[in-house]
């Protein structure tokens, strides 16, 4: 009687252990996806501020249409890329979003460089309020990125640890990329000052 009990117990135990590992990987993957969605929420907030910023600047920057158009085009591209990444936050989609964010950062940097040469615009109350909102949103985005990177590190560490690595490969759990894994050349910091 004991001869059949040990193999059955071993099979049940190993099956149970694999279920626990699989569920842990699913939970960590979902936490990573949730952390990305927090970035997405803050980026959406940022993208929603930009048209107001451009409209406020438009009254003062009549001869800077190219600058304003580049900001709006970069914003629209980043928003479309964000929506695609929301559907499926794959490493490729996140890489495209990071690239779109770098382009938008460069366009915003150009806008704020132009704003510096217009004292009336710098003194505008609406522009000041939008500037404060943008700075606050940038801080929220930075915090969300940090939380995302933390979730990615936990997920990747677990995914690459034995015995989880065996089930991760069979279960299709792909390595996640950190938000900051873009080249130094693509990074453009948005400097806003009034």
Regions found by a protein language model. Name each.
Residues 1-194:
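A helix-centric hydrophobic-segment signal that preferentially recognizes long
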């Amino acid at each position: 009687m004991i001869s059949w009990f040990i193999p059955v117990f071993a099979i049940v135990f190993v099956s149970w252990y694999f279920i626990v590992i699989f569920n842990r990987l699913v939970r960590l993957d979902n936490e990573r996806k949730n952390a990305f969605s927090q970035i997405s929420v803050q980026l959406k907030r940022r993208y929603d501020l930009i048209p107001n910023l451009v409209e406020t600047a438009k009254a003062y920057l009549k001869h800077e249409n190219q600058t304003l158009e580049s900001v709006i085009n970069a914003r629209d591209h980043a928003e479309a890329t964000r929506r695609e990444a929301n559907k499926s936050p794959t490493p490729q989609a996140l890489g495209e979003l990071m690239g779109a964010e770098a382009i938008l950062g460069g366009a915003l940097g150009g806008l704020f460089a132009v704003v510096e040469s217009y004292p009336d615009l710098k003194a505008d109350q609406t522009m000041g309020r939008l500037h404060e909102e943008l700075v606050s949103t940038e801080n929220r985005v930075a915090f969300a990125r940090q939380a995302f990177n933390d979730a990615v590190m936990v997920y990747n560490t677990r995914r690459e640890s034995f015995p989880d690595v065996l089930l991760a490969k069979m279960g299709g759990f792909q390595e996640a990329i950190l938000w900051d894994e873009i080249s130094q050349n693509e990074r453009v910091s948005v400097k806003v000052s009034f």
